[in-house]
C-alpha cells in the first residue's frame, strides 16, 4: 500500500508497484500515450510526480537502452498497471525497472479525477509513502518540505566534469544501433548541462556535432576562451528541472556569453534562461505542458507540428522586443520558439528530439548547424 497526501488536503491510500520509501514532489500530468520509460528517466522531472493520463501502463515493459539519463522522477501515478508485458526489446517489467531506480509506482488511482484537480488548482505539492500511512504525519512532512521553486535541482542532475558525448544511436531505418564515429563530426559545441536528455545529445551528434558536456556552473570566460581558440564553435543550453529564476549564478554567466556573440541554441530550460539573461523573466503556467501530443505552429512556414513538451514555465510576450517569434503553442498561444535579433541565438520551448514523441521538429537541430556555419569562430 502507498499513502498520498496533497497540499489541498486530499488523502488517498492505493496500491504500490514500484520502490519503497517516502518522496515529496510537485504533481504534474503527462498526456503521452507511450514512451513512459523516457518520461520517467527525463532529468526535467526531477522532484516531480507524474500522472499518466493513459489508463493502461506497463504493457511494453522496460529495457536498459532507452533511458534518457541516470536520474528519475520522484514517482508515477497510473490508473492500471499491467505486469504482463510484450515487446521484443523489453528486458524486464516496469515494476522491476522502478524498484531498480528507486522510483515510487502508484496504481489504482482515479487519474482522470486527479488531472481535473490539477487543471482547476494548478500544480500541487504531494507526499507519497509506503512506510508512513498516518494522514497527520504525512501532512507534517509535506508542510516542512521545501517548494520545488526553492530546491536547487539542476546541481543534482548536471555532469560534475567535462565529458565528451560518444553514444551509439538508434537507427529507425535499420532498427539497430549505430556506433559513434568521430569522422562524422564537423563542428564541436559546448553543452551547458542543466539536466540534458540523452536523446538531445544523440540528435546533436546525428547532425554532425561533437558535444563536449560542461557542468552547469561553468564560467563564461572559460567558454569564451574555448570559442576564441576554435576549440568550440557554439554553445547549446540544455533542458533541466526546476524554476529557471532560481539559477541566478548561471543566468549571470549566460548574459556574458550573449554579449560575446557566440552562436547558441537553447531547448526548454535553456530557452527560458536565454530570455531571463536578457531581462525578460519567465512566468509559471497553471499546470504546465507535459506530453508528446502538443500542436505548435511554425510561424515561418505556417506548418503545424505535433511536439513533445515538458515545462511549467514560459517566456513572456515582451521578448518580441528583441526576438522574432518563430513558433506558438496552439493550445494556449504561448511562445514556443524565438530567433534573437541582437545575437546569433535560436531557442525553442518544446523538445525537437521528441523521445517520446513525433519527429516533426527534428529540423531545428539542422538550423543550429546552419547558424554555426553562418557565424564562424573568430580568427
Curated annotation (Swiss-Prot):
CPSase: region residues: 1-184
Reaction it catalyzes: hydrogencarbonate + L-glutamine + 2 ATP + H2O = carbamoyl phosphate + L-glutamate + 2 ADP + phosphate + 2 H(+)
Pathway: Amino-acid biosynthesis; L-arginine biosynthesis; carbamoyl phosphate from bicarbonate: step 1/1; Pyrimidine metabolism; UMP biosynthesis via de novo pathway; (S)-dihydroorotate from bicarbonate: step 1/3
EC numbers: 6.3.5.5
Domain named Glutamine amidotransferase type-1: residues: 188-378
UniProt KW keywords: Amino-acid biosynthesis, Arginine biosynthesis, ATP-binding, Glutamine amidotransferase, Ligase, Nucleotide-binding, Pyrimidine biosynthesis
Gene3D superfamilies the UniProt entry points to: 3.40.50.880, Carbamoyl-phosphate synthase small subunit, N-terminal domain (3.50.30.20)
Residues binding L-glutamine: 44, 240, 242, 269, 272, 310, 313
Keyword Transmembrane: no
Active site per database record: 268, 351, 353
Alphabetical list of NCBIfam families matching this protein: CPSaseIIsmall, PRK12838.1
Role played: Small subunit of the glutamine-dependent carbamoyl phosphate synthetase (CPSase). CPSase catalyzes the formation of carbamoyl phosphate from the ammonia moiety of glutamine, carbonate, and phosphate donated by ATP, constituting the first step of 2 biosynthetic pathways, one leading to arginine and/or urea and the other to pyrimidine nucleotides. The small subunit (glutamine amidotransferase) binds and cleaves glutamine to supply the large subunit with the substrate ammonia.
Family to which the UniProt record says this protein belongs: Belongs to the CarA family.
Name of the molecule in the record: Carbamoyl phosphate synthase small chain
Organism listed in the record: Helicobacter acinonychis (strain Sheeba)
Taxonomic lineage: Bacteria, Pseudomonadati, Campylobacterota, Epsilonproteobacteria, Campylobacterales
Gene name per UniProt: carA
Amino acid at each position: 500500500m502507498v499513502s498520498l497526501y496533497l497540499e489541498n488536503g486530499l488523502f488517498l491510500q492505493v496500491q504500490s508497484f514500484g520502490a519503497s520509501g517516502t518522496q515529496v514532489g510537485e504533481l504534474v500530468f503527462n498526456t503521452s500515450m507511450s514512451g513512459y520509460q523516457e518520461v520517467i528517466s527525463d532529468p526535467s522531472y526531477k522532484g516531480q510526480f507524474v500522472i499518466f493520463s493513459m489508463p493502461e501502463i506497463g504493457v511494453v515493459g522496460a529495457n536498459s537502452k532507452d533511458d534518457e539519463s541516470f536520474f528519475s522522477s520522484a514517482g508515477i501515478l497510473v490508473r492500471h498497471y499491467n505486469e504482463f508485458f510484450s515487446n521484443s526489446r523489453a528486458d524486464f517489467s516496469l515494476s522491476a525497472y522502478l524498484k531498480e531506480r528507486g522510483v515510487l509506482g502508484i496504481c489504482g488511482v482515479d487519474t482522470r479525477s486527479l488531472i481535473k484537480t490539477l487543471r482547476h488548482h494548478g500544480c500541487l505539492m504531494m507526499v507519497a509513502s509506503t512506510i508512513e500511512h498516518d494522514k497527520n504525519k504525512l501532512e507534517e512532512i509535506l508542510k516542512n518540505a521545501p517548494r520545488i521553486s526553492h530546491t536547487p535541482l539542476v546541481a543534482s542532475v548536471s555532469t560534475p566534469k567535462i565529458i565528451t558525448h560518444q553514444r551509439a544511436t538508434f537507427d529507425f531505418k535499420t532498427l539497430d544501433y549505430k556506433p559513434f564515429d568521430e569522422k562524422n563530426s564537423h563542428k564541436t559545441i559546448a553543452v551547458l548541462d542543466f539536466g540534458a536528455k540523452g536523446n538531445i545529445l544523440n540528435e546533436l551528434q546525428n547532425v554532425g556535432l561533437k558535444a563536449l558536456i560542461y557542468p552547469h556552473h561553468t564560467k563564461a570566460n572559460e567558454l569564451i576562451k574555448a570559442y576564441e581558440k576554435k576549440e568550440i564553435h557554439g554553445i547549446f543550453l540544455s533542458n533541466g528541472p526546476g524554476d529557471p529564476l532560481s539559477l541566478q549564478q548561471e543566468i549571470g554567466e549566460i548574459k556574458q556569453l550573449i554579449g560575446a556573440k557566440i552562436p547558441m541554441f537553447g531547448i526548454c530550460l535553456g530557452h527560458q534562461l536565454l530570455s531571463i539573461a536578457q531581462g525578460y523573466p519567465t512566468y509559471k503556467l497553471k499546470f504546465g505542458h507535459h506530453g508528446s501530443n502538443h500542436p505548435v505552429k511554425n510561424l515561418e512556414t505556417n506548418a503545424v507540428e505535433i511536439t513533445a513538451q515538458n515545462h511549467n514555465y514560459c517566456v513572456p510576450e515582451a521578448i518580441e522586443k528583441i526576438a522574432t517569434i518563430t513558433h506558438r503553442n496552439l493550445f494556449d498561444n504561448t511562445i514556443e520558439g524565438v530567433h534573437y535579433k541582437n545575437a546569433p541565438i535560436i531557442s525553442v520551448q518544446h523538445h525537437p528530439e521528441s523521445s517520446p514523441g513525433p519527429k516533426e521538429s527534428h529540423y531545428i537541430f539542422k538550423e543550429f548547424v546552419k547558424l554555426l556555419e553562418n557565424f564562424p569562430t573568430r580568427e
